[in-house]
A protein has these predicted regions:
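A ubiquitous short alpha-helical element
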Residues: 1, 74-76, 105-108, 125, ...
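C-terminal all-alpha effector/ligand-binding and dimerization domain
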Residues: 149-207
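Hydrophobic, amphipathic alpha-helical faces that serve as interaction scaffolds
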Residues: 83-94, 118-159, 163, 191
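Long, contiguous secondary-structure blocks with strong helical propensity
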Residues: 2-10, 115-122, 145
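Amphipathic alpha-helical dimerization/coiled-coil segments
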Residues: 87-115
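Short linear motifs at protein or domain termini
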Residues: 1-93, 97
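Hydrophobic side-chain positions on well-ordered alpha-helices
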Residues: 18, 23, 125-127, 167-171
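Solenoid-repeat scaffolds in large eukaryotic assemblies
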Residues: 103-104, 133-136, 174-180
Length: 207
């Protein structure tokens, strides 16, 4: 049992990173047997790992259809963006309430904007020093990771937008970061119909 648990924990981490990296598209099925073959393991730890990802909202398990990357409706995606915004704004409030002990460490340079966005939001959550809040941000951040990959081409000036967020964070300018985060998520809520349609089109190309 310990070997199975260890293997399933390893697989959980690998598949989670694959989802964040956009290896699987929203709506795409993940076949446990294929994953087991790729990692040369049995189905049991694979199913444990996939079920754990279902519990965290990164996958869904549909009757007779198996494990899939969630394909949100317009309402669900708006709710997800709204929730992410509220969590990050709350984290900023916690951080602003404390004296600045040291300047935030610079974010490592990377042209991968979805990855850098995940890292920045995770850092904001972690620096709030509130375990439950950081946990909620981490899970919501993970749920949005595959969506960020799928819709990246729809966002104009994404690099400049991320630079504005990082600049406000590095300056410890919480009012500016608050307003920039709100504007960031408002733009995405306005694009929800286009994002959902784009993801549906990409999913149809899988068949």
């Amino acid at each position: 049992m310990n070997a199975i648990h260890s293997k399933s924990s390893y697989l959980y981490g690998q598949i989670r990173r694959d989802l964040q990296a956009g290896r699987y598209l929203p709506g795409q099925r993940i076949d446990p047997a294929t994953v087991a073959g790729e990692y040369r393991t049995s189905l049991t730890p694979v199913r444990f790992a996939l079920s754990r990802l279902v519990g965290y909202g990164m996958l869904c398990d549909q009757p007779r259809a198996g494990f899939h990357v969630p394909m949100p409706t317009e309402m669900q995606l708006r709710d997800l963006y709204d929730w992410m915004e509220r969590l990050l704004v709350m984290a900023c409030e916690f951080t602003a309430a404390r004296p600045l002990e040291a300047a935030p460490a610079p974010m490592p340079g990377d042209d991968d904007i979805p990855k850098q966005t995940w890292k920045l939001f995770d850092t904001i959550g972690r620096q709030a020093r509130h375990g439950a809040l950081h946990h909620a941000i981490k899970r919501t951040n993970d749920r949005l990771a595959a969506i960020r990959r799928a819709k990246h081409a729809l966002i104009d000036h994404a690099a400049e937008e991320l630079a504005d967020l990082e600049g406000a964070w590095q300056a410890h300018d919480m009012p500016r970061l608050d307003s920039t985060l709100r504007a960031y998520h408002q733009r995405r809520r306005q694009l929800v119909p286009c994002i959902v349609a784009h993801m549906a089109e990409r999913r149809s190309q899988l068949h």
